[in-house]
């Protein structure tokens, strides 16, 4: 960890606890700050808050009183999930108190350079691929951010010869000031999180903060097939490394003659890649670009791509039962993700879909039903998905109450060489706490079939 004195004896407000807030508060106390911790949950229900209080911190729970800002606060470190429209953040902004997220702290104390990966879809897969490629290439990566350990915990122990690989959300990137990744990657942009950002433009601008402080000594890895990403990255001062699945890129990454190329050099044959899905080729090109920029060999990259089958809950291969392959894509919480999952297979598909009703219809899925032979729906959106399936002319359409029932029905409708795919196209919160819980229940139900 760098020797950092800027926080000594400063009054710093950590807003929202959870994992990142807890880690930030602990770090700031270690750096000599006077830490005030504030969380909306009552102290009686807040184990982490009680632990911080036991460490001698001033803890205020059960709301976000504006009076906290009267304590000569020099910095607010906010939980990424707390919107900037929250009155205490509005007031802090009016008082010109800097507001950052935990990843900014991590960067300021780290001896190791950062790789920052953002985008609407594919962040986790790309981050894991990058980590695995760098690890295979003996480049000493550590993983942090939305996956792995909280960034400021990792950064404390990171050495100069290591590299911190971080998955970054728009929420985190809104709160950066000096954060300057050596390599920043912007994968794609789709309309999302409008309840937080208001408009797609504001959402995109938050994502583009990943390039904000880069210089000509840094690299900006950019999806050349995404017009929004190209526009948002136009002003980056980093060296642009473009990647594309649709056109040749001489000074970047592309697909040519059934192989992946980087700066004109063949790296790996497409046939060596076991991860399914056209969309995953974009993720692979981005990860490969980062790995090559950090000196990873083609051999190391190929070894990883021959074994990497995906990230849990993201088009994850589960098992094969009587020549039916089961895939868990519980992370598909919107139609776009399900469209990509359906496009990944040429075999007949039995689709399990449904979940929280956010008011949208599912007609956009109809063109992607061409390989779907049967659909089993569940959750709040089941009737809407049934309507879309009927419009698509599917012969086998069923609705059930639970995911366990859906798995049994899906297996009954499948035949040898079919794919049984959970890709809900909806959030999970109508029946499950998280998409991870939904995916785990699917996997358990599949194994009960054996």
UniProtKB/Swiss-Prot annotation:
Its domain of life? Bacteria
A Pfam family assignment: Mur_ligase_M
* Molecular function, one GO term: UDP-N-acetylmuramoylalanine-D-glutamate ligase activity
Mind telling me which GO cellular component terms the entry cites? Answer: cytoplasm
User: Quick one: a GO biological-process term for this protein?
Assistant: peptidoglycan biosynthetic process
| Localization terms from the record | Cytoplasm
Protein EC: 6.3.2.9
Which pathway, metabolic or otherwise, does it act in? Cell wall biogenesis; peptidoglycan biosynthesis
Residues annotated as binding ATP: 119-125
Reactions listed under catalytic activity: UDP-N-acetyl-alpha-D-muramoyl-L-alanine + D-glutamate + ATP = UDP-N-acetyl-alpha-D-muramoyl-L-alanyl-D-glutamate + ADP + phosphate + H(+)
Q: What is its main location?
A: cytoplasm
**What keywords were assigned to this record?**
ATP-binding, Cell cycle, Cell division, Cell shape, Cell wall biogenesis/degradation, Cytoplasm, Ligase, Nucleotide-binding, Peptidoglycan synthesis
Kindly give the HAMAP family that the UniProt entry links to this protein: MurD
Q: What is the role of this chain?
A: Cell wall formation. Catalyzes the addition of glutamate to the nucleotide precursor UDP-N-acetylmuramoyl-L-alanine (UMA).
What the record says about family reads:
Belongs to the MurCDEF family.
User: What protein am I looking at?
Assistant: UDP-N-acetylmuramoylalanine--D-glutamate ligase
Q: Which organism is it from?
A: Bacillus cereus (strain G9842)
Its organism's taxonomic lineage begins at: Bacteria, Bacillati, Bacillota, Bacilli, Bacillales
Q: Which gene encodes it?
A: murD
